[in-house]
Regions:
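Hydrophobic h-region of N-terminal signal peptides that target proteins for export
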Residues: 7-15
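Cys-nucleophile CN-hydrolase/nitrilase-fold catalytic domain and related Cys-dependent amidase chemistry
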Residues: 33, 42-128, 179, 198-210
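Hydrophobic/aromatic beta-strand patches that form the interior of the parallel beta-sheet core
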Residues: 22-24, 56, 108, 134, ...
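CN hydrolase (nitrilase-like) catalytic-core segments centered on the catalytic cysteine
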Residues: 85-106, 163, 172-248
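Active-site catalytic loop in hydrolytic enzyme cores
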Residues: 98, 114-184, 203, 207, ...
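Short beta-strand segments enriched in small/hydrophobic residues
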Residues: 17-29
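Solvent-exposed loop/turn segments at secondary-structure junctions
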Residues: 27-30, 61-64, 114-116, 142-143, ...
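Sec-dependent signal peptide recognition
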Residues: 1-7
Length: 273
């Protein structure tokens, strides 16, 4: 009887549609990468134990988002590059890569990336095989990140769960960014963030999801929103403490990019000004 029950439960779980996303609303310590990594590992293990297939941490989580002048007024470029930034193939990122493989999950992390003599505000997505599935560097800022080089590409990654794109924090306030990802085929957009959150942000994130027909995960140290392609919040954080927010995303053929087919791109050439 017990064996039958276990088999039944397994069959139901296996048949459940979509994929389970875990948004980690975690507040890191400035400059304390070892402590932040230990906390990430602890929460990622909890999320994976509860069935998460995709785990997302906030913007700049690894180093504590010290690259923003509002957070670190006395920051210098030399200190930022030397003490905050990490190479994607360095020891700490290799450890996180191994964690994704060990837990058999997709794991997204925000960090200051050292690359080609510059520093980028980057979100990297590691696959369940421990490989780099995607890497996106923040392309829009409010001039409060003077030592970060702006990214210039919006990659869309094909996975077994669908096509995924990434924006970082202020990128989300520029509507063209999410639209470009949708036009490139993204059905889910991950938005690791740090700055503003609250009622107006909740509305904006729902609009971004609805107007582009995409699932959207907003992951902030004090706020998480998981929104489906109809603009409905399917899960959200409670309070502002460290926590995990779970939500199941599906790719609906009916809702995916629902509004895009009515566009008339030939009328919008003025948008490139």
């Amino acid at each position: 009887m017990l064996r039958f029950l276990l088999l039944t439960l397994f069959t139901v779980a296996a048949a459940e549609p979509g994929y389970l996303v875990a948004a980690l609303s975690l507040t890191p310590e400035p400059w304390n990468k070892s402590a932040n990594l230990a906390k990430l590992e602890r929460y990622a293990r909890q999320a994976a134990a509860q069935g998460a297939q995709v785990i997302v941490a906030p913007e700049g989580y690894l180093e504590g988002y010290v690259g923003n002048q509002n957070r670190t007024p006395d920051l210098t470029q030399e200190r930022y590059a030397a003490q905050a930034a990490e190479d994607l193939n360095g020891a700490l990122l290799t450890r996180i890569r191994g964690l994704a493989k060990e837990l058999n999950v997709y794991l997204m992390l925000g960090f200051a990336e050292k690359r080609e003599g510059k520093v980028f505000n980057t979100a990297v997505l590691f696959s369940p095989r421990g490989e780099v599935a995607s890497r996106y560097s923040k392309s829009h800022t409010m001039n409060d990140e003077p030592f970060n080089t702006k990214g210039a590409a919006f990659p869309v990654t094909q996975t077994e769960h669908g096509q995924w794109g990434t924006l970082i924090c202020f990128d989300r306030q520029v509507p063209e960014t999410a639209r470009l990802l949708a036009l490139q085929g993204a059905d889910t957009i991950f938005v690791p963030a740090w700055g503003g959150y609250g009622e107006m942000n909740d509305i904006m994130m729902r609009v971004r999801a609805y107007e582009n027909g995409v699932n959207l995960a907003f992951v902030h140290p004090k706020r998480a929103l998981l929104i489906d392609a109809s603009g409905k919040i399917i899960a959200q954080s409670q309070g502002e403490h460290d926590q995990i927010t779970f939500g199941r995303f599906e790719v609906s053929a009916k809702r995916k990019h629902a509004m895009l087919k009515y566009r008339r791109p030939e009328l919008y050439t003025g948008l490139t000004r």
